[in-house]
Amino acid sequence: MSTGQSEDHLPISAAEAERLFAPFADSGVLTLAVSGGPDSMALMWLAARWRATRAGGPRLLAVTVDHGLRPESRREALMVKQLARQLGLTHRTLRWSGEKPAAGIPEAARIARYRLLARAAEQAGASHVVTAHTRDDQAETVLMRLLRGSGIAGLAAMAPVSRRDGLLLARPLLSLSKARLLATLRSAGIAFADDPTNRDPAFTRPRLRALMPTLAAEGADPRTLATLANRARRANAAIELMADGAERYLALLAAGRSSKRRGGEGEMFDPRAFAALPAEIRLRLLMRAIDRVGTEGPVELGKAEALLERLDRTLAGITDGGTAERGTLKQTLAGALVSLAKDAIRISPAPPRRRRGE
């Protein structure tokens, strides 16, 4: 067993907790997302222990979202409240009320959960919503993105800090294994809830979770998959930087021609300059423009790729002096109209759809 593997079963030390939460030392309030499961209970305990060692620091608000999907959920929320009280933390339970969808429950519950967490954080004046995502969660997310055919940005999976619903979402435990969180709870004598939904084969994530031991035996263990996500994130950041530069370059060209349309009218690219860019940069610039101008975004990657292929074929007819597809294109996507004539690629708001019978 390697050193890294043996460390995966050790409790998290006070020194490690200090490093994990150090980026939040100057925050006024932190909202901790605590469901009652082992990961989030470990998060709350670690955050409280870290806060207790500091003369100053953020106030910690533990928030439990009761989705009302299982009869045990109220009892689990009460368990979180009791531990939070023992740790000297403020606790709130928020309930997902209203009718639940017949299908797509995990995604609907996730959206509702983050909406409620964001609202609680905003009311408390919190700088971050802190979640207990682990390296194991990251590995599962990478696999899910692979199965969906995600691009580089998707394979980067979860970032340590990201923005959602106007707030910063922080994942300080993303580099740690779930086994270490369990070891921490055992060492501290802290109980936690066991949600059977996490093992329900009716849902994609639990099915992939059940496959992890087999994948690990072939070398695709959580550490390796998380490393893949980190490398994809680095590559994505580099490509985004290049796309920013290309976008500025095209804007300067358009300004020089005094023909760039602004505001609600849309955007314009010089066809030859656009065609000279690498394919991934062209794709990102196209998606950015569609998302800015369109009304039905964000645009789907696969549909944007198909549009770019058609645009490239049409551009070939212009840049090579030929007549491929007669050198013109007009297509709507995600509420935007993408058109190409000899002088410009234009992305503008799509006209309203006609109702049947009109």
UniProtKB/Swiss-Prot annotation:
Asked if the keyword Transcription belongs to this entry, the reply reads no
Location comes to: Cytoplasm
- Reactions mediated catalytically: cytidine(34) in tRNA(Ile2) + L-lysine + ATP = lysidine(34) in tRNA(Ile2) + AMP + diphosphate + H(+)
Sorted keywords for this record are: ATP-binding, Cytoplasm, Ligase, Nucleotide-binding, tRNA processing
Coiled coil stretches, renumbered? none
An example Gene Ontology molecular-function term = tRNA(Ile)-lysidine synthase activity
Enzyme Commission number, as recorded: 6.3.4.19
Q: Name one GO biological process term.
A: tRNA modification
Per its UniProt entry, what is the enzyme's top EC class, as one word? ligase
- What cellular component GO annotations does this protein have? cytoplasm
What main location does UniProt list? cytoplasm
- Residues involved in ATP binding: 35-40
Q: Which domain of life is it from?
A: Bacteria
Q: Which PANTHER family match?
A: TRNA(ILE)-LYSIDINE SYNTHASE-RELATED (PTHR43033:SF1)
Q: What does this protein do?
A: Ligates lysine onto the cytidine present at position 34 of the AUA codon-specific tRNA(Ile) that contains the anticodon CAU, in an ATP-dependent manner. Cytidine is converted to lysidine, thus changing the amino acid specificity of the tRNA from methionine to isoleucine.
Note what the entry says on domains. The N-terminal region contains the highly conserved SGGXDS motif, predicted to be a P-loop motif involved in ATP binding.
Which family does the record assign? Belongs to the tRNA(Ile)-lysidine synthase family.
Protein name per the record: tRNA(Ile)-lysidine synthase
* Organism whose genome encodes this protein: Bradyrhizobium sp. (strain BTAi1 / ATCC BAA-1182)
Phylogenetic lineage: Bacteria, Pseudomonadati, Pseudomonadota, Alphaproteobacteria, Hyphomicrobiales
